[in-house]
Amino acid sequence: MVIIHSPSYDLHNHEGHVENSGRTRAILRAIESSDLSPRFVEPGMAGIDDILMVHSSTHVEYLEVFAGRGGGWLDYDTYMTPESFSVARLSAGGAMLAAEEALRDGWSYSLGRPPGHHATYDRSMGFCIFNNIAIAIEHARRNLGVSRPLVLDFDVHHGNGTSSIFYRDRDVMYISIHQDPRTLFPGTGFIDETGSGEGEGFNLNIPMPRGSGNREYLWILGMILPAVLEGFRPDMIFVSAGFDAHRRDPLAEIMVDEEFFSWIGWFIHQTGLPCTAVLEGGYDPEALGRSNIAFMRGLDGEEYEPETAAPGGVSEIFSQLSDRFSAYFNF
């Protein structure tokens, strides 16, 4: 069990903002109070050339200058401190190192911030500076021999940045389960956003109704994930690990709890594939700590017997997905 973390992540911090250094401190406290014994590894910064694998040079240069002038607000909810450019490079470097460790040890977890899955090719947004998981994926493809990565994003918000970066790529399978984008930021992640060009069919969104809980999440993922794994045949799994779908989280209206995070960790473990998880959202400190422990136990192979899954109000969503992806996967 390998966790990538640096105390320097705390230098990107705004105490009046929900995305603050207390998030990772809550997770570290939960680990310390548990019986888990991970090996902690401190990362180095991603090189500028690494960042440019998924971001434009103009955008990267702008962020460096912006932070150098003292930082501030990139938009209405995304901040930078004077240290944020370096810390964001460190967070991306942590995700890259996590990919390397997963290929050696089976699974790893980049416990870094700022998060990344909303960052697009040329824009930082949604608390995200650089797209950490996309950088790690490109590092794995170009340098580590990975050819068919699958991305599972269970953050409650659609990972519009990751989706857009790989939208035309047939060799990266992106799956996101998130709250209905008609009711939540960033307003993307509809069923008909399936990829384009050669990437058509390799971008799969599962928009969940407000109030969905463990039973609905387990049912629809249990119907979809095995079929996608069989059809796509990935050689590595990358997880955008957001915990803001928890019922206690203040930013959304999905109602899962630790049982879901236990199950999804255990499901990934059962695939036998190397897995890198990268921290995304989760804004209730207590729930964030408990959910991370549950997820890590599952990834580490602790068997989990889920509660009875049931379609509830999501059977129509599954029907639409089945029709839309019938040419690609046998749901």
Curated annotation (Swiss-Prot):
Instruction: Give the E.C. number(s).
Output: 3.5.1.-
Give the co-factor note: Binds 1 zinc ion per subunit.
Record SUPFAM superfamilies: Arginase/deacetylase
Pfam families the record matches = Hist_deacetyl
The biological processes this protein is annotated with in GO are:
epigenetic regulation of gene expression
Keywords for this protein: Hydrolase, Metal-binding, Zinc
Active site positions: 118 (proton donor/acceptor)
Instruction: Give the signal peptide range.
Output: none
Matching CDD domains: HDAC_classII_APAH
Q: Which residues bind Zn(2+)?
A: 155, 157, 244
What the entry lists under InterPro entries is as follows:
HDAC_PDAC (IPR050284), His_deacetylse (IPR000286), His_deacetylse_dom (IPR023801), His_deacetylse_dom_sf (IPR037138), Ureohydrolase_dom_sf (IPR023696)
Q: Which cofactor does it need?
A: Zn(2+)
Q: Where is this site: Polarizes the scissile carbonyl of the substrate?
A: 283
Q: Which GO terms describe its molecular function?
A: histone deacetylase activity; hydrolase activity; metal ion binding
Lineage, top-rank taxon, reads Archaea
- According to its UniProt record, which protein family does this protein belong to? Belongs to the histone deacetylase family.
Describe the function of this protein: Probable deacetylase.
Q: What is this protein called?
A: Probable deacetylase MTH_1194
Give the source species. Answer: Methanothermobacter thermautotrophicus (strain ATCC 29096 / DSM 1053 / JCM 10044 / NBRC 100330 / Delta H)
